[in-house]
């Protein structure tokens, strides 16, 4: 399942993000989307987990204050 993360800094380290997200399950891929406002990229994290687990992960991450910003996480139901 894919989780959309917003709120990370523009210079977020994909390898560090992969490492941190791997605590929730196997990370298949991470795509950085920098179109639009380059200061506010968003990331699509593809985890090898079912929808229920992905929803739990998104709920745990959503609203965390990380490096001067609040993170937001949503499960991507299509795609």
Tell where the protein language model's regions lie, with residue ranges.
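Canonical RRM/RBD RNA-binding surface and closely related RRM-like beta-sheet modules
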Residues: 1-74
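Glycine-rich beta-strand-turn "strand-cap" elements at beta-sheet edges
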Residues: 76-79
């Amino acid at each position: 399942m894919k989780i959309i993360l917003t709120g990370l800094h523009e210079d977020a380290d994909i390898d560090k993000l992969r490492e941190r997200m791997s605590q929730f399950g196997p990370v298949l891929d991470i795509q950085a989307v920098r179109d639009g406002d380059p200061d506010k990229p968003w990331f699509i994290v593809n985890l090898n987990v079912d929808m229920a687990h992905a929803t739990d992960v998104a709920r745990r991450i959503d609203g965390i204050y990380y490096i001067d910003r609040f993170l937001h996480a949503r499960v991507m139901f299509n795609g």
